[in-house]
Amino acid sequence: MRNNIAGPPITPVQATVKVTRVRQMDPTDLMSMKILLNILLRRTFESSLGMLNIRSGFYDLRNPSIHAIQIDGRGYDICWIPGFRLTTATLRGKLGLQILPETTKVRSKSMNELLTERRGNIHPSALAVITVMAMHNGKVFRVHSIVQGQTIVSPLANGNETDYFTYYSTRYRDKIDSAGLSLLRHNDYCNSVMQQDKFILKLTPLKRTQNGKVVRPCNVPSSLCIIISDNEIAPYGVSKLSTNRAAVALSTMSPDALLEKATAFAARLAEDTELQSLLGDYGFGFTSNPLELETFVCKPPKLMMDNTSRIVTIEDDSGGVFHNLLQSPGVSPIYYSNNNQPATGMPVWAIMVPRNLGNDYARRLRKELTERVRSLAGTTAPNIGDPPLIAVELSNQRREMYRVEPYKDAFKALLNKLRLEYKDARESEIVAKIQLVVIVIPGPKQDRGDLYKGIKQFYTHMGIVTQCLLAPKSSQNELQWYDQAVLRSVCQQIYAKAGGAVWAPVLPPQNVYSKSTMLCALDISRPKKTVGRPAEVPISTAGFISTYDGSFEYIYSQKKTLVPNRLNHGGELQQQTLMEAFIKNSCNVYLAFNNRILPDHIVIFRDGVSDSQISATLEVEIKSLYECLRQIYHKSNRPMCDLKVIVAQKTCAMRFSAVGGTVLRSGYYVINRSPDNRQQGSEFLMASQAIVHGTTPKPIRYKIIFDSMEASVDNDSFNQLIELTNAMAYGYVNWPQAISLPHVLHMAHHLSKFCGEVLRNGDDLFESCAIFGLQYRPFFI
């Protein structure tokens, strides 16, 4: 086992590829595919104890490193050039690795200054990089970007922008600047890279700034690739995309359109006599027709989703490279309605839109929301009904616009519309049939606070889940439509609130906590101190979240209002009773969904507990909780479970410094190796980003304050517990927001804050029959 805080390794490291975070994206979108690949490479290389962040350069910069990576049980060599970083690329429809100069990480100098220092003099008005892709054993592609000495200038654009590019070939290595090849250090390594005489030539428009730096213009959407093979150059497609509108437009083009655009670009190059003369000296010629190569495909890989097995497979023309790595959103078979009976789908839901937004906006919103939610539902899409449109009569006066009464009147109109369909049903039965209501409210955010709270209070106390959506901004008497990422996030929340499983963590099956485990989280929301009222004690709200299935996708929520007590008389008894009630209800729910079998492992995450409060928490809450669980398991004739209580502390004053000028990988670090976790507590720290020069942003400190098994830090169970925490904190699929805490603790925070600040501490969820069904759905997000 490698030491966590030692310097960077220089020996080969065995690593396992594992997906830790994936977002829902369009399979045909090249930009989305690039985002997916970046996510795969950012956090997928794990060693035995932590993350192996290849992108941040966690290697010896003086020597080349070759690391064996296991992908689906097959080994591949990933070659890394010192001073370069790994990114992603696609070739022949497969996933690949791309290496680009890591100048910003290696030293704080511009590309121009670095190359001038490394290579001597460069072209006075040009700077370029070549991307070389080579196939290894027919499976994995290694892509290298090498700065070369020969720079060819082709004035193809007007103004200050000029296309600069270079090329490389093993046949003419002696004609290339030897200083550029010195970056590779070893000729044997260079020969192993250039096994095939097929290369990608990347042409990037560059321009020189006033201070002499050469940069890529912001308005350049992409770089077009050209294939060099058998002394011919042919178009390939889009190589690099940025986030501007022109690039996004290119990313949505069909493969035929991309190939046509690349062909036109190659035709422009073929007409340049100066360029042909320069390349002719090296034996290369131009052709405007695509090469007849079956292995080169101008299209991205496809994401194939299996709704039954809940697995996404990345396929290509030759059968695929990465299989069974991603979990799809899937379909939720169970959620509870008010009559305590399981239901499937979302047959009854509605959309409320202010009338002043117009009919065109309302119809387009209904169409897009319905199509996106049905795409998430998979095979159960027919169970997603067509939502009726309900007009909300809002006043044009700004003061009257943010009143909740028009939305209450719109709900009455919805009930009247549903009475025509359910003529013999009572009003309470009709209300129970409504799964969700999408409500469009006027902006801006700073003005809609009371309206939002009023809507949530009105609908939640009736047991109806709502999804609020801000009205779009108007520009030149036209409404600006929503960003696609916003609509995608809204639809995922709608599907989750209806009972679907959208956010799933990725945990290896060999981890002991992947089976028969119940995760719990407790968070207490305390409102801001009341100014000018020192005698008042603010009311606090406790939110408790527990999981009841093996994949940790479905949650059961509980809420309790803590009685204010200035002298804390009976406060310890209140906390003790609170935890016992929470855990009893959670165990009953777990029994109902798991064939009357209790979990073998229970992991409880706590937030808001400082070091000075740990001893009191152990004496007051944990001991009584442990005895309560022993009684529950004794009645069920089951052995006592493995109980662990972990405190997450967001305010962490620890600092890490990079060792020897290197970069510490992101992941987790074991701080305290205590053999007795119940008495002293083992600690580990998680950081979401690599530690470069000193500190890391917002590290989370985890302290195991209770462990019924008393596992030491060297035990496999402890390492698997860290892996579980890491998966819950960073491994959730499709979560639209940033997560730094474990997901159950994140949800408990949302629950306590929503009930305390929005619902204003109304009826407790597990004491109110009217909103019993909401406990199984994340209505509070």
UniProtKB/Swiss-Prot annotation:
SUPFAM superfamilies (alphabetical): Ribonuclease H-like
Ranges for domain Piwi: 436-760
GO biological process: cell differentiation; regulation of translation; regulatory ncRNA-mediated gene silencing
GO molecular function: RNA binding
Cell inner membrane keyword on record: no
UniProt GO cellular component terms: cytoplasm
Subunit structure: Interacts with miR2. Highly specific binding to the mRNA m7G-cap. May be a component of the RNA-induced silencing complex (RISC), a sequence-specific, multicomponent nuclease that destroys or silences messenger RNAs homologous to the silencing trigger.
PANTHER family per the UniProt record, alphabetical: EUKARYOTIC TRANSLATION INITIATION FACTOR 2C
Comment text on domains: PAZ domain is absent, but Ago is capable of binding small RNAs in the same way as the other Argonaute proteins.
Name of this chain's protein: Protein argonaute
Gene from which this protein is expressed: Ago
